[in-house]
Amino acid sequence: MTVPQLLEHRIDTLFEQLPLVGRLGQAFQEAGHELHLVGGSVRDALMGTLGHDLDFTTDATPDQTEAVLRTLTHATWDIGRAFGTIGARIDDWVVEVTTFRTDAYQPDSRKPVIAYGETLEEDLVRRDFTVNAMALNAATREFHDPHAGLADIVAGKLRTPFPPERSFSDDPLRMMRAARFTSQLGFTVTDEVRAAMTDMAGRISIISAERVRDELSRTLLTDHPRAGLDLLVTTGIADHVLPELPALRLERDEHHRH
């Protein structure tokens, strides 16, 4: 099966097995808005491993989003209206819908200045890795892949939409996510991503200990945590977030030499 055939097959399978996506797309379209399945939801659907959480992006404002969702369910909640996100439970699925965003970062902070965007392309380019920067129109099934994320899935590569130095400067926690996805997806980082992680390892220190811990826990809970931990050690990030880990590796290497 060719890649285009596989793409078509996986999209057809998604809409057949999960008609909710089409229902949501139609509801937003009838209200005059776009709705796109996005991020890890698209990645997982294309890999045949879709979970029970669905992430969408839209040109609708949070108030408009809530109004549309209320036509399908009474179980809606405000996840973070300031960030443009409204949540809902429909059938057995948890749905999060976020208004198109363009984020700006200050050099000394990880917290973005949130602004609503006008286009899907603006929203996708701000995402962490190309494999998470794809979108699928929930009404028309049109596939958007401006940063060649599908090719990176096929190649098993982690690459950033922006140059990695800019991406990791904006949000250093993305370096921890690279380790998690290495373990979770079985992918490898590109040479450029690895070099940027090595050069910018110290920038992880601006991230709160709680958020680092949460990301590290997600890595440890994957089926293959060693791959991600090895990446943290070889890039020097572990020296800042888990200094015991490089020390254990050094002790093991010295033991093997004796």
Labelled PLM ranges:
Residues 1-258:
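Catalytic cores of the polymerase beta-like nucleotidyltransferase superfamily
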